[in-house]
Amino acid sequence: DEFSNAIAILPVETSYKGIIRETIDNLIMTKNQNIQILAETVIPVNDCILSKTTEFYSVMGLIANPNALGKCKKFIKDEMPRELNIVMADSMDDSARLLNNYNLTYSIIGTHKTAELYNLNILKEHIEDDKDNNRRFIVIGDGTTQSTGNDKTSIVMFLDDRQGALMDIVQVFVKYNINITHINSKMMNNRAEEQAVFLDFDGHKDDEVIQSLLADLENNCKSIRVIGSYSRF
C-alpha cells in the first residue's frame, strides 16, 4: 500500500556486473516526465539449479545465459558433470521456456521465483561464486515521496559535449558539500554534440540545500530533470 502508485520494479545494479545500462538509459529517455523513482531496495542474489527432475545427480545438461554462467563458474566446474551439455539462452526466463524442449536430465540457473513461476524443482541453492552478490532494484511510479533525513536523489542533466563540462557539474557538488554516489554519462545519438549525465547523490529534493544545488546546476547545463528523491536503503 505504501507505493500503490508504483508501476514497475527495475533492476539497476548488481555486485557482479555493476550498473545495468538498459535501466539507466530507459530512465534518461522516458517521455513521461511524471515517472519518478519512489524507492530502492537491495536483495541478496540466490542463484539455484532448477529442473523438472528431483535428483541433482541425474542432471546432464544446463540451459543458461552467458551472465548466469559467468556468475556460477566454480560451481559448474566443481559440482556438475565434466561432459555437461550447455545450451545458451538469452535470459533466465528464456532458459525456463527452453527447458520444455528438453528431457528431464536438463536444468537451468534461476531463482526461487523462477522455480515458482515455471513449476520447477530447486536442486541446489547459492551456486553463485560471489556469496556477497547483491542486486539493487528501484521502484518507479507516478508520484513523490517525503523527506526522511536519509535520502538519495536521482537526476538527469543534458550537457554540451565540451571539454570540462562534466567537471563544472562536479564542482557545483563540491561547493555545496553534497556527496555524489553514482555518475554515468552517455552521448545522445539523436542530439549531436550533447551528452546525458545521470547522477545519484545524498539528500532530498525538498531539502533547502538540495534546492539551492539544483538551481545552481540548472545554470550549468542545457536542461535538468529530477527523476526522484527516495529513502536510502
Language-model segments: what does each one mean?
Residues D1-F233:
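Domain-level signature for soluble enzymes in the chorismate/prephenate branch of the shikimate pathway
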